[in-house]
C-alpha cells in the first residue's frame, strides 16, 4: 500500500523538523527548506516540483522571523511570508491538494493588557512581520482546500527553538539572559502542534472546508519572563535572568509599534497542559 505524499516546506526548522519526526513512519515525506532549495521570485521551481511529486498535502512551515530583520528586509519578508503561501494556495486549490499554512499571533495589534485573541477577532498588525502574515491570512481564507493554523509562542525540545537555544547557550557559556517582563503570549509545546496536525487535521478533511482558520493555544496568558523562569526552575541550572522592559531590545526600531499583549484563545484546539512545561523540554541539551 502506497503511503500518502506530503510536501513539507521548511522542514529544517523547529516545527518542520518536529513534523518530520512525527510523520515519517506513516507518510512519504518530501522535505525542502530555504537551505537546500532555490525559491525563485515566481516560485516556478517549486511549482515544477509539486507537479512532479503530486503530493496529497503541502504543509508550509517557512517564515521570515525577527522584528529587526523583517523591518530591514521587507521584500524578502513579503516573498516568503505572503507571496509563497499565496502561490502555493493558488496551485493547491486548482489541483485538489490540501494546503496547511502556519500563521502567527502577530497578526493582532496586541495593545490591550489581558486580551487574548480568538479566531474571529479582527487582525490589525503593526510590524512588517505581522503585516506579511496577515496579508497571507486574508488571502488564504478565500481559497478552497486551505487551512490556516495560527500559533502563539512556540517552545520545543530542540535547540532550533529560540527560547531553548538561548537557555542552552546561557548554561554552556555561563552568560546572563535579558528577558522581557511586559510581553505576553500563550506558549504552546511544538510537539503538541505537530501531534494535532498528525492525529486530527491530516485524517479529517472537514478541517479544509468548515474551518478556514484555527488557533492552537493553551488559553493561558503568561509573561515571557515568568514563562522562562518556569523552565529554569525545571532544569535546575544556574542561569542569570535579568528582567527588562521590551524596549531594551527595540532600540534600533523605536518607531515600530511592537505588540506586547498577544496570545491566542480558542474553543476548538486547546492544549490541555495549561502551559505545564514538559520536563523533557530540553532533554539531552542541558546536562
Region spans (language model):
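N-terminal Rossmann NAD(P)H-binding glycine-rich loop of SDR-like oxidoreductase domains
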Residues: 4-24
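NAD(P)-dependent short-chain dehydrogenase/reductase
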Residues: 138-185, 190-199
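Catalytic helix-loop patch of NAD(P)-dependent Rossmann-fold dehydrogenases
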Residues: 79, 83-84, 107-149, 153-155
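Adenosine-cofactor binding site in Rossmann-like domains, unifying the SAM/SAH pocket
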Residues: 28-48
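Mid/C-terminal beta-alpha module of Rossmann-like enzyme folds, strongest
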Residues: 196, 203-253
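NAD(P)H-binding glycine-rich loop region in Rossmannoid oxidoreductase-like domains
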Residues: 43-80
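NAD(P)-cofactor binding segment of oxidoreductase domains
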Residues: 72-100
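C-terminal amphipathic/interface module of NAD(P)-dependent oxidoreductases
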Residues: 239, 257-287
Amino acid at each position: 500500500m502506497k503511503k500518502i505524499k506530503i510536501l513539507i516546506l521548511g522542514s529544517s526548522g523547529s516545527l518542520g523538523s518536529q513534523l518530520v519526526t512525527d510523520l515519517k513512519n506513516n507518510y512519504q515525506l518530501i522535505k525542502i527548506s530555504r537551505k537546500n532549495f532555490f525559491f525563485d521570485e515566481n516560485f516556478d521551481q517549486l511549482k515544477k516540483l509539486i507537479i512532479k511529486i503530486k503530493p496529497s498535502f503541502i504543509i508550509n512551515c517557512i517564515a521570515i522571523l525577527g522584528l529587526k530583520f523583517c523591518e530591514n528586509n521587507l521584500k524578502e519578508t513579503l516573498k516568503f511570508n505572503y507571496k509563497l503561501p499565496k502561490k502555493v494556495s493558488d496551485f493547491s486549490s486548482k489541483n485538489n491538494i490540501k494546503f496547511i499554512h502556519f500563521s502567527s499571533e502577530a497578526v493582532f495589534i496586541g495593545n490591550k493588557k489581558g486580551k487574548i485573541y480568538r479566531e474571529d477577532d479582527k487582525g490589525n498588525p503593526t510590524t512588517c512581520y505581522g503585516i506579511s502574515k496577515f496579508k497571507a491570512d486574508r488571502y488564504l481564507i478565500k481559497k478552497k482546500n486551505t487551512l490556516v493554523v495560527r500559533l502563539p509562542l512556540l517552545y520545543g525540545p530542540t535547540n532550533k527553538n529560540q527560547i531553548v537555544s538561548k537557555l542552552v547557550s546561557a548554561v554552556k557559556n555561563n552568560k546572563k539572559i535579558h528577558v522581557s517582563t511586559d510581553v505576553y503570549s500563550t506558549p504552546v509545546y511544538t510537539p503538541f502542534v505537530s501531534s494535532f496536525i498528525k492525529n486530527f487535521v491530516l485524517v479529517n478533511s472537514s478541517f479544509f472546508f468548515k474551518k478556514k482558520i484555527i488557533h492552537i493555544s493553551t488559553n493561558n496568558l503568561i509573561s515571557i519572563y515568568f514563562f522562562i523562569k518556569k523552565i529554569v526552575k525545571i532544569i535546575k541550572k544556574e542561569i542569570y535572568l535579568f528582567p527588562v522592559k521590551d524596549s531594551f531590545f527595540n532600540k534600533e526600531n523605536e518607531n515600530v509599534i511592537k505588540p506586547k499583549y498577544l496570545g491566542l484563545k480558542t474553543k476548538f484546539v486547546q492544549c490541555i497542559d495549561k502551559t505545564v512545561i514538559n520536563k523533557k523540554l530540553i532533554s539531552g541539551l542541558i546536562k
